[in-house]
Amino acid sequence: MSVTKKPDLNDPVLRAKLAKGFGHNTYGEPAWPNDLLYIFPVVIFGTFACCIGLAVLDPAAMGEPANPFATPLEILPEWYFYPVFQILRTVPNKLLGVLAMAAVPVGLLTVPFIESINKFQNPYRRPIATILFLVGTLVAVWLGIGATFPIDISLTLGLF
């Protein structure tokens, strides 16, 4: 039979620390040294074991050799560049395309200043940041999917 350590929630010192939201993990134990000395090495070792195991058991396959004289009809970037590629492809002016790409990180930098009056860390209590995250994710997915289609149906994804 295992013994589980449960925090004494009647302790006023522990209640004060938990009310502030720092210094203890979910079980009420101190974060130092328990998390840094016991949990983190296990996570790091597990991550290395997974990476090495995948590299040994499933090595990357080599593709066909490159032919510099036969280029594909449409060159696409890697999948994580699809939204940026779609912005550059659909905006008619190159300067406007670059400004539209620069507006994304500038907009993300303004979120902490908008939400600075809100002291909650719970995402349900930070509606502006949560809505911006959800809208930004949907727009990025929409642009990423649209980048795989030809230019004439890329914005509407062929829906209308």
UniProtKB/Swiss-Prot annotation:
Membrane topology (UniProt): Multi-pass membrane protein
GO CC field: chloroplast thylakoid membrane
Cellular location(s): Plastid, Chloroplast thylakoid membrane
Keywords: Chloroplast, Electron transport, Membrane, Photosynthesis, Plastid, Thylakoid, Transmembrane, Transmembrane helix, Transport
InterPro entries in the cross-refs: Cyt_b/b6_C (IPR005798), Cyt_b/b6_C_sf (IPR036150), Cyt_b6/f_cplx_suIV (IPR005870), Cytochrome_b_C_euk/bac (IPR048260)
GO MF annotation, one: electron transporter, transferring electrons within cytochrome b6/f complex of photosystem II activity
A biological process from GO: photosynthetic electron transport chain
Transmembrane regions listed in the UniProt entry: 36-56, 95-115, 131-151
Pfam families referenced in this protein's UniProt entry, alphabetically: Cytochrom_B_C
HAMAP family documented for this protein: Cytb6_f_subIV
Self-association state and partner proteins as the record states: The 4 large subunits of the cytochrome b6-f complex are cytochrome b6, subunit IV (17 kDa polypeptide, petD), cytochrome f and the Rieske protein, while the 4 small subunits are petG, petL, petM and petN. The complex functions as a dimer.
Function: Component of the cytochrome b6-f complex, which mediates electron transfer between photosystem II (PSII) and photosystem I (PSI), cyclic electron flow around PSI, and state transitions.
Family of the protein in this entry: Belongs to the cytochrome b family. PetD subfamily.
Protein name according to UniProt: Cytochrome b6-f complex subunit 4
Organism of provenance: Chlamydomonas moewusii (Chlamydomonas eugametos)
